[in-house]
Amino acid sequence: LQHEYPNLFPSDDAKLVAGNTKEAGSYLWEMHNQNELELDFRPLSMSIMYHTPCHLRALDPNYNGLKLLQLIPGLNVLNADSGCSGMAGVYGLKRENNRTSLRVGWGLISTMQKTQAQIGSTECASCKLQMEQGVDKPTIPPIALLAYAYGRLPEVKAWIQTRHDSLVVP
């Protein structure tokens, strides 16, 4: 929306929408920096492995979903810091690209296999698929974890306890 919308629909309205569009985590972090974010989180006693998606690094080099999650008391947030997931949107879902996708994302996949963290977390649905390759740990969006810590989205508890079949031989 920020970059392509004004090109697709060249109008003042499109520019207005593009100029006021933010990724949810960036918006919440901005609120926190302005002391406008309520911090009445319930403690979450668990460890998570957080992955910053490539598109978020490109959109906002200063964005740090890791710091946003670290506001939740009791949550041990580990940084995957393993590079690209290799998915590139739907690229990695195509049969002819699957091997390349797995090779590119192997750093992240192996980090998830080795971690003691109970769950993974990322903003990107494509990265989520790759993070769940070869592990039985769920990957949950940061915004859902924040909502759960606020006492919302009670179904997150079931998501946290969900185990997946290993899709890739470890």
Per-segment meaning from a language model:
Residues 1-170:
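Iron-sulfur cluster-binding electron-transfer modules in prokaryotic oxidoreductases
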